[in-house]
């Protein structure tokens, strides 16, 4: 399983970090885990979901 941060998820999906954070607030994306520092981590399914929503 790949673990993506918000910035890496945005980069791989070709969208801005602001779009990813907006989708988080709207409930379209959810992190699968959090780092000890509180950063959300996303999996490959989240990347696919983000690409699907953007299409």
UniProtKB/Swiss-Prot annotation:
Pfam families: MerR_1 (PF13411). This is HTH-type transcriptional regulator MerD. Keywords: DNA-binding, Mercuric resistance, Plasmid, Transcription, Transcription regulation. Residues 6-25 bind DNA. GO terms for molecular function: DNA binding. It comes from the Bacteria. It comes from Pseudomonas fluorescens. SMART domains: HTH_MERR. GO terms for biological process: negative regulation of DNA-templated transcription; response to mercury ion. SUPFAM superfamilies: Putative DNA-binding domain. Residues 3-55 form the HTH merR-type domain.
